[in-house]
Amino acid sequence: MYNRSIQIIAVIVLIFAFAIPGAAQTDTAKGPVYGWTHSVIGTLTATQVAFTDWAQGGENALAWGLALDGKSTLDQPHTNWANSYKFGFGQTRLGDQGIRKTDDRFDLESMLTYKMSEHWNPYAAATLKTQFAPGYKYPSTGPEVRVSQFFDPAFMTQSAGVVYQPVAEFKTRFGLGLREVLSSKFGYADDPETATEIEHSSINGGLESVSELTLKLDEQVSFSSKLELFSTFKHIDQVIMRSDNTIAAKVSKYITVMLNVQLLNERAVSPRTQIKETLAMGLSYTFL
């Protein structure tokens, strides 16, 4: 499992390595524009299928998803304060199964950078990841089992270090950080080494690395990728990896096709690498 995680990380790093030279060719002649800038993009997807006396068979189905992706940045001559927020929620109903959750995302990040040089600068950052609604597992026999809910679990980090940004499309940072996990009922913060008690919170110091790449592949096609790595001092050989990759193609002014692949490797939560893939077409609107 550890070797597989290293292979996944290596592939993502190679993507960054080949993409950066192309990004470096973009126009940098424009001068800086200071002040607040905001961007908010909302996406709505929906699918409905209904059968009446259909001889070939089939199941009635209804699925919907709502996503909001925003950024707010305050750029000043000596500092840059970047904030990002990603929210998503979706449900589906297939036949008589009832409504089930298919997407649930609550992701906040804030980073303050002090400008000391053109490419290398110190930073301080904080993140929060959780979900909106309860999550369930559905065994083949028996009732559904609740396995998560709002702020259970909640993952938070605070870090400080150095950020390197050679071009506008790519940046990577490395630093020291704290990582907290909160879990009141479902044991996500429990330490398996203490068998006699169940911890509801954990705090670990460690090393953080975050790399982000945003590319305009075509006039209507964009690619974004974010790789987050955290290794605690207690288990320095166990790298917690989160990878979020999206290709979006604008079919028309308000219709977008999007492919998103998320990878998560955290041995304390699951012994295997978790993979989530979403292919959706729906309405997309840029608010700001």
Question: How would you describe each model-predicted region?
Answer:
Residues 32-48, 79-81:
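Transmembrane beta-strand segments of Gram-negative outer membrane beta-barrel proteins
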Residues 44-50, 76-78, 87-93, 128-134, ...:
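Transmembrane beta-strands of outer-membrane beta-barrel pores
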Residues 52-58, 93-98, 141-148, 193-199, ...:
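Extracellular loop and loop/strand-boundary signature of outer-membrane beta-barrel proteins
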Residues 70-74, 114, 164-166, 211-215, ...:
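Residue-level signature of outer-membrane beta-barrel architecture
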Residues 78-81, 119-122, 169-172, 217-223, ...:
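Repeated loop/turn-to-beta-strand initiation elements of outer-membrane beta-barrel proteins
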Residues 99-206:
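Outer-membrane pore/translocation modules
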Residues 275-288:
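Outer-membrane beta-barrel "beta-signal"
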